[in-house]
């Protein structure tokens, strides 16, 4: 007979840290250059006009303007920035 009680080790009991992925700025929102639009794994969304992509596939605004989402079918879903036209007053 054993003199010590058998101690089992659990294979569960751990969890990864949250990654906070997803859309950060939605369609129609005004953004500043550098604002993060989407954090994603892979290219669920692709970069359209005035949008850059980081090395972890994060999409960010390159210009000030309004966020626009477009679905181009087989080509995928694109996010672009519609730059606001600034009118110059004539003196």
Swiss-Prot record:
Q: Which domain of life does the protein's organism represent?
A: Bacteria
The answer on whether this UniProt entry bears the keyword Ribonucleoprotein reads yes
PROSITE patterns linked to this entry: RIBOSOMAL_L27
Any Pfam family the entry gives: Ribosomal_L27
An example GO biological process term is:
translation
Gene3D superfamilies the record matches = 2.40.50.100
NCBIfam families given in the database record:
L27 (TIGR00062)
Question: What family name appears in the similarity comment?
Answer: Belongs to the bacterial ribosomal protein bL27 family.
Q: What is this protein called?
A: Large ribosomal subunit protein bL27
- Look up and give the organism this protein is from: Deinococcus deserti (strain DSM 17065 / CIP 109153 / LMG 22923 / VCD115)
